[in-house]
């Protein structure tokens, strides 16, 4: 059992999945969301014994983290992120965290336009070919939740520009970059 403290910021699909995986890997987990957490995510977190809070950030708990998993919608300029940065607490993404705990092949698709169509088509082709494949990222379920609760040999992952932030050691087996426009 690890006594390392993981703080997850954001209680949506990405954050909830990361919190469940961290809990199952033996981390001391705290999830915090400045907004309201949907009931389905509260139920998921409760079912795995993950402690959480909503509509606030308890700084003393967040700033005691050994590592922070940040959901893609949280800007680096948010006050809590600035405080985390000043303390040099490592910040990673859900995808980065999940990648540590699976040997599955990763097919990652990013770019400005055509990501979802290409991701869904790739998933369909691989599934039709008889592969044990999961769909994650911007479409499908949280990669971390799937790594925690399911087994797939291949994951097809749609990655937005925001999801690419805070990824450092994650390695895709296949990487596809669609069109890139100035807004990305």
Can you annotate each of these PLM segments?
Residues 1-93, 97:
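N-terminal leader/targeting and accessory segments in enzymes
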Residues 60-63, 72-184:
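Phosphate-binding loop of NTP-binding sites
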């Amino acid at each position: 059992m690890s006594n390392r403290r993981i703080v997850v910021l954001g209680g949506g699909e990405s954050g909830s999945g990361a919190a469940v995986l961290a809990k199952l890997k033996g981390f001391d987990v705290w999830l915090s969301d400045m907004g309201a957490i949907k009931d389905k995510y509260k139920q998921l977190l409760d079912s795995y014994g993950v402690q959480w809070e909503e509509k606030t950030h308890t700084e003393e708990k967040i700033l005691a983290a050994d590592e922070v998993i940040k959901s893609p919608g949280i800007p680096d300029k948010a006050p809590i992120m600035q405080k985390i940065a000043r303390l040099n607490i490592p910040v990673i993404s859900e995808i980065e965290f999940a990648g540590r705990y699976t040997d599955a092949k990763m097919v990652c698709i990013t770019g400005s336009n055509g990501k979802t169509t290409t991701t869904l088509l790739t998933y369909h082709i691989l599934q039709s070919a008889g592969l044990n494949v999961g769909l994650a990222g911007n479409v499908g379920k949280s990669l971390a939740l799937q790594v925690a609760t399911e087994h797939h040999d291949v994951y097809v992952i749609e990655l937005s520009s925001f999801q690419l932030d805070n990824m450092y050691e994650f390695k895709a087996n296949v990487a596809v970059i669609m069109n890139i426009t100035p807004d990305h």
